[in-house]
A protein has these predicted regions:
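N-terminal capping/small domains of soluble enzymes
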Residues: 1-82
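Hydrophobic, small-residue-rich alpha-helical packing segments that form membrane-like cores
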Residues: 61, 82, 86-101, 105-157
Length: 157
């Protein structure tokens, strides 16, 4: 058995809310977050500030939890925009959360086809986005979208 600490990250309140027929209210999210905290979850990804009124309101005045870190979810900055000129990124950065998880394209195919930029431009955008979260005094987490597909296609990237 290893002595390294395993951290638990729950996405029920954001990813689970994408299920057809599921629509968490602000109160629902609060009650579920409290129970996840009691269960010992370290990070609770509670939503995507700026994506809908419930998540924006949740992160404007987040509830206090015991040990769990309420985590805001968002995307790295959009290509062709500065951090300051990206409303989506700014909404996530404005969240009053101790941790922010940014999703980033990590498959060079998606970088080319979906983003239309070079791999180097993508990596710089990721670096700049993470640096902005850290500079704001919060913990930055990175969700490497389609990591295994990307690794299979291009391990060097």
């Amino acid at each position: 058995m290893t002595r390294e600490r395993l951290y638990l990250y729950d996405t029920t309140l954001r990813d689970g809310a994408q299920t057809q027929g599921v629509d968490f209210s602000l109160e629902d999210k609060g009650l579920i977050a409290q129970q996840l905290d009691v269960l010992g979850i370290d990070y609770i990804e509670a939503g995507y500030p700026g994506a809908n009124p419930t998540d924006t309101k949740l992160f404007a005045a987040p509830q206090k939890l015991g040990l769990a870190k309420l985590t805001a979810f968002g995307m790295t900055k959009r290509p062709g925009r500065s951090l300051a000129n990206d409303p989506g990124f700014q909404a996530v950065l404005a969240a009053k959360a101790p941790a922010i998880c940014l999703v980033a394209k990590t498959w060079d195919f998606h970088v080319d086809v979906a983003l239309g930029i070079t791999p180097e431009e993508n990596l710089q955008g990721i670096k700049d986005s993470v640096a902005a979260v850290v500079a704001s005094g919060r913990e930055a987490l990175l969700d490497c979208e389609h990591f295994f597909d990307g690794y299979k296609a291009n391990p060097a990237y």
